[in-house]
Design a protein with these regions (language model features):
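Mid-to-C-terminal secondary-structure elements
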Residues: 126, 131-146, 154-256
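A short amphipathic helical element positioned immediately N-terminal to and/or at the very start
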Residues: 3-15, 84, 88
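Short, strongly hydrophobic transmembrane alpha-helices
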Residues: 19-44
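Membrane-helix entry/capping segments
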Residues: 1-4, 250-268
Length: 268
C-alpha cells in the first residue's frame, strides 16, 4: 500500500468516526494545555520561592572574626578592621554581587528619646552602609534607607526598628523627618523597618545609622569587629562567590600560603 493510499485510508477513518476523532483531539489538546500550565506554575513557584528567600537575606553570606554558631568555647580571631572591610568592599568584583559593611556600636544599652517618650536602655545601635538593608533582608515599611550622599557626609539620619518606633511614636504620628535623640545625640528619622518578630535576634529593637556617622558620633563605642556581608542575585552563585570572597579576604588579611583562615564565612 502506498503512502497516498495510507493517508486516504486514515482520512476516511477520521470521517467515519468524526465524533470519536474530535473527542480524542480535544482530550490531547486539553492534556497539552494542562501540562504547559503545570510547568508554568512550577517555574513561577520556583521564582517566588527564590524571591522570598532573597527577601529574608538567604542569598547572602557574612565574613566575621568569629563563628555565629558555636558552643561559646571558640576563641575569636583577630578583629576585622574598618580599613580591611573597606578594602574588601572596594576590591570584591564578583559578577552582580554587592557588599555591605556594618558594626554594632552600642550593644543593647542605648536609649532612644522623642519629646517626652523614650525607650528602655536596651537598644542596639548599628553603623551600616547603603547596602545593609537590602542584603540583610530588611523591608522599609515607611520612609527610605540611606543614600550614598548621607554616607559620604556622615549625615545625622536614622532608620528605626519597628519596636523602637512604636515606643516613641503613636499610631497617629508620622515619624518621618521627626527629630529624636540616641544617647542624647540628635538624629532625623528617615525610615522605619518592617517588623521581623522575636525570632530574628531582636532586630526590631535596633536602630540603624550611617557607618560614617557612627564612627564620628560614637567613636569611643566598644566595637568588637566589623562585619562584611555579601549578597548575590542568583542562589546558584553562592558557592563561587564564597570562593572568591575567601581568596580576597586572605589577601586583605595578608595570609601566607598554608596559613589557616583567620576569619569565618557563614551563609545567612
Amino acid at each position: 500500500m502506498t503512502l497516498k493510499e495510507n493517508i486516504s485510508l486514515a482520512l476516511r477513518a477520521i470521517r467515519a468516526n468524526r465524533l470519536r476523532s474530535m473527542i480524542t483531539i480535544t482530550i490531547i489538546a486539553i492534556g497539552l494545555m494542562a501540562l504547559i500550565g503545570i510547568l508554568t506554575a512550577i517555574d513561577a513557584l520556583e521564582g517566588s520561592i527564590s524571591s522570598n528567600f532573597a527577601t529574608l537575606g538567604a542569598n547572602s553570606f557574612s565574613i566575621r572574626n568569629f563563628n555565629e554558631i558555636s558552643d561559646g568555647d571558640e576563641t575569636p580571631k583577630p578583629a576585622i578592621s574598618y580599613k580591611e572591610a573597606t578594602n574588601f568592599k572596594k576590591e570584591y568584583q564578583f559578577r552582580s554581587a554587592y557588599v555591605s559593611i556594618s558594626s554594632v556600636f552600642i550593644r543593647g544599652s542605648a536609649t532612644v528619646k522623642q519629646a517626652d517618650k523614650k525607650t528602655n536602655p536596651n537598644v542596639d545601635v548599628l553603623g551600616v552602609d547603603e547596602n545593609f538593608i537590602t542584603i540583610g533582608g530588611y523591608t522599609i515599611s515607611s520612609g527610605r534607607g540611606f543614600s550614598a550622599t548621607e554616607l559620604e557626609s556622615a549625615a545625622r539620619v536614622v532608620v528605626l526598628g519597628s519596636d523602637v518606633a512604636k515606643k516613641i511614636f503613636t499610631e497617629k504620628d508620622n515619624p518621618i523627618d521627626k527629630g529624636i535623640s540616641i544617647n542624647n545625640q540628635y538624629f532625623r528619622v528617615i525610615g522605619i523597618l518592617e517588623a521581623k518578630g522575636s525570632s530574628f535576634m531582636q532586630s526590631d529593637t535596633r536602630v540603624l545609622i550611617p557607618l560614617t556617622t557612627a564612627r564620628s558620633v560614637f567613636p569611643q563605642a566598644g566595637i568588637d569587629s566589623y562585619v562584611i556581608s555579601v549578597g548575590v542575585d542568583n542562589p546558584a552563585d553562592m558557592e563561587p562567590a564564597i570562593g572568591d570572597a575567601t581568596g580576597l579576604m586572605r589577601q586583605v588579611r595578608k595570609l601566607r600560603i598554608g596559613e589557616e583562615d583567620d576569619f569565618t564565612i557563614s551563609k545567612s
